[in-house]
């Protein structure tokens, strides 16, 4: 199995919009291409921001790469993402003013021995 963690720091005034976008746009698209969501959580980061993270599961790293390639090739989805950014001032504006940090990280299993 391959697991990844998607991590964000988001300004509090954008939390509702960010959650709506995930549930309405990103989650259905990820699932339709074969991603499996283990869970998604949020917690206060400081008085102005909220931390989000999601854990995703794949059968292998190769499956993850294949699924991600399908997602970025999905022009309908890509256009929805572009339109969402534009509705909020453009991608650069959103990433400078609302979504302050993004990480996409491989997780390493510490319970099951690797062979």
Where do the language-model regions lie?
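Short acidic/glycine-enriched loop/turn segments that link adjacent beta-strands
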Residues: 46-50
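An amphipathic, aromatic/His-enriched active-site/gating alpha helix that lines ligand/cofactor pockets
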Residues: 20-39, 57-103, 115
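Short, solvent-exposed loop/turn elements at beta->coil junctions and helix N-caps
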Residues: 41-44
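Surface-exposed interaction/gating patches
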Residues: 1-17, 36, 106-115
